[in-house]
């Protein structure tokens, strides 16, 4: 890292551009011939891709790239990591969309009033495989240094301003997740991190899940990815707090 950047930490996170190999925000293009798109829809393991109407749900997407392989005229993955949204429906992209919209009007005013300068989060792995959890841990390493913005993770929900949930929300963790969230003082935020947290991912239809937590609690930030890149996490949190804008 020191050899690549000239210093240990990335100096300006706003100027970060990921490699072309990184699969970030997809661009969809409509074609009259839907043969390839229909093939991609049939191939998608989570039902994230639809041919008619042409759309891709990032909240379900595993970013495996198979849709782009079989339907290159319809879908192309860019290296844009700015894919967080304050709403679940904001993760659904359509033909012609050039970015994932982040409407500041959908952010509760108390979030920016109370947490703009400092935010402590409690992470709950709700049946995750460890990949998203490792990426969240990486946000605080010497390279990304999320702590420079006054944002970090704490062990106790009593010390936290909000909860970050990863994993598909299994039944075994349902009660513990509720207890943890209730232990955080108001006002608080709720972040769903990773495709599994957003939709259940590959396990969406599993009987082992219990996603009823989302029936009574509305997330403030949805961060797709399988796993979610540290830059996606950082960009989403800073945009939620009003410390940067989605241009």
Language model features with spans:
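Ferredoxin-type iron-sulfur electron-transfer modules and their immediate structural context
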Residues: 1-47
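Iron-sulfur cluster-binding cysteine motifs and their immediate structural context
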Residues: 28, 37-85
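Flanking helices and flexible, charged tails adjoining ferredoxin-like Fe-S electron-transfer domains
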Residues: 68-150
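Generic secondary-structure signature for well-ordered alpha-helical cores
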Residues: 113-116, 129, 182, 186, ...
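Cofactor-cradling patches in redox/metallo enzymes
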Residues: 134-136, 144, 148-232
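A charged, well-structured terminal subsegment
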Residues: 223-247
């Amino acid at each position: 890292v020191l050899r690549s950047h000239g210093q240990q930490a990335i100096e300006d996170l706003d100027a970060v551009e990921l490699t072309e190999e990184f699969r970030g925000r997809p661009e969809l293009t409509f074609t009259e011939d839907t043969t390839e798109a229909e093939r991609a829809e049939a191939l998608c393991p989570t039902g994230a891709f639809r041919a008619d109407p042409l759309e891709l749900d990032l909240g379900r997407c595993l970013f495996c790239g198979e849709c782009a392989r079989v339907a290159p005229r319809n879908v192309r993955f860019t290296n844009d990591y700015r894919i967080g949204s304050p709403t679940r429906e904001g993760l659904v992209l359509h033909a012609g969309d050039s970015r994932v919209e982040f409407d500041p009007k959908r952010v509760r005013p108390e979030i920016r009033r109370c947490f703009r300068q400092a935010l402590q989060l409690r992470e709950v792995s709700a049946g995750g495989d460890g990949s998203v959890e490792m990426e969240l841990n990486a946000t605080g390493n010497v390279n990304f240094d999320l702590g420079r913005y006054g944002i970090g993770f704490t062990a106790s929900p009593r010390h936290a301003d909000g909860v970050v949930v990863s994993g598909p929300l299994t039944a075994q963790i349902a009660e513990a997740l509720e207890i943890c969230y209730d232990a955080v003082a108001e006002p608080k935020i709720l972040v769903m991190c990773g495709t599994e947290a957003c939709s259940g991912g590959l396990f969406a239809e599993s009987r082992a899940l219990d996603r009823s937590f989302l029936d009574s609690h509305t997330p403030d930030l949805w961060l797709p990815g399988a796993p979610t890149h540290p830059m996606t996490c950082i960009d989403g949190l800073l945009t939620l707090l009003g410390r940067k804008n989605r241009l």
